[in-house]
């Protein structure tokens, strides 16, 4: 949450830019009396307002004390880790939006297990676990060419590649071509493109984050919880608003990959 602390206005603006697409994913589950937990919520006033307008009861959980304080000052129902450990409230919907990749990027295996168990223990029988996150195609065979728009963009891209490889986010299936572009597997290209667009100011933080969530969802949710959870649907979205940001770095006519994956699970009754 360093971004929030250092530049509150920019942080909230960024959160609000994606609020409508974030809300659309869970809108059909919401009605009067439904309790929804925004797990790893951050601060998104527009999203909170949309939830309130649906008649559902909004609860937020975030590990940042700064975020907790800000949310409480807004009158939001803030849930603590202690509340979740003690199962103070049972939820009809638990929503992880752009959070699961952080769980698999930063938490130890033991912490991941404990976190997922905590989520499951606070989900009502028949309730829904909704995971909205990156959509890396996880394809290590198909190749794509990535061409930077300038020498500066090329240098920044190469800096990201170096750090992503150092942090084991991408492998060596990435080759420099004579024109300054690179050829990379779809899995690597996804990481390179969507990391580079953050800019070098975010290098130290974002270069540690894994955007390939498919394997993580299978390993940490589907396999260990197969007797308690049923995967209802998986679908993908492409956010075209990424294009102008990507075009600052790469020669692209369209967003080359789907940007979000949505996994919807239902807990057995």
Regions found by a protein language model. Give the residues of each.
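Local beta-strand N-terminus motif with an aromatic residue
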Residues: 91-92
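A conserved beta-strand element that flanks and buttresses the S-adenosyl-L-methionine
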Residues: 95
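Short catalytic micro-motifs in class I SAM-dependent methyltransferases
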Residues: 98-103, 133
């Amino acid at each position: 949450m360093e971004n929030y602390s250092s530049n509150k206005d920019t942080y909230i603006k960024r959160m609000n830019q994606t609020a409508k697409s974030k809300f659309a994913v869970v809108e059909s589950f919401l009605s009067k009396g439904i309790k929804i937990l925004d797990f790893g919520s951050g601060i998104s006033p527009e999203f909170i307002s949309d939830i309130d307008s649906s008649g559902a009861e909004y609860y937020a959980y975030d590990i940042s004390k700064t975020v907790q304080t800000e949310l409480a000052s807004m009158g939001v129902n803030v849930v603590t880790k202690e509340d979740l450990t003690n199962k103070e409230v049972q939820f009809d919907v638990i929503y992880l939006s752009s959070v699961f990749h952080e769980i698999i990027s930063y938490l130890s295996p033991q912490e991941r297990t404990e976190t997922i168990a905590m989520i499951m223990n606070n989900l009502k029988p028949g309730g829904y676990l909704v995971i909205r996150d990156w959509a890396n195609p996880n394809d290590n065979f198909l190749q794509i060419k990535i061409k930077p728009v300038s020498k500066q963009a090329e240098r920044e891209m190469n800096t990201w590649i170096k750090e992503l490889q150092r942090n084991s986010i991408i492998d060596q299936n990435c080759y420099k071509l004579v024109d300054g572009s690179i050829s990379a597997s779809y899995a690597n290209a996804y990481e390179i493109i969507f990391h580079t667009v953050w800019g070098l100011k975010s290098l130290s933080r974002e270069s540690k984050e894994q955007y390939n969530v498919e394997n993580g969802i299978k390993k940490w949710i589907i396999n260990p919880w197969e007797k308690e959870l049923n995967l209802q649907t998986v679908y993908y979205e492409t956010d075209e608003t990424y294009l102008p940001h990507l075009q600052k770095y790469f020669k692209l006519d369209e967003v080359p990959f789907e940007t979000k994956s949505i996994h919807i699970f239902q807990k057995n009754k």
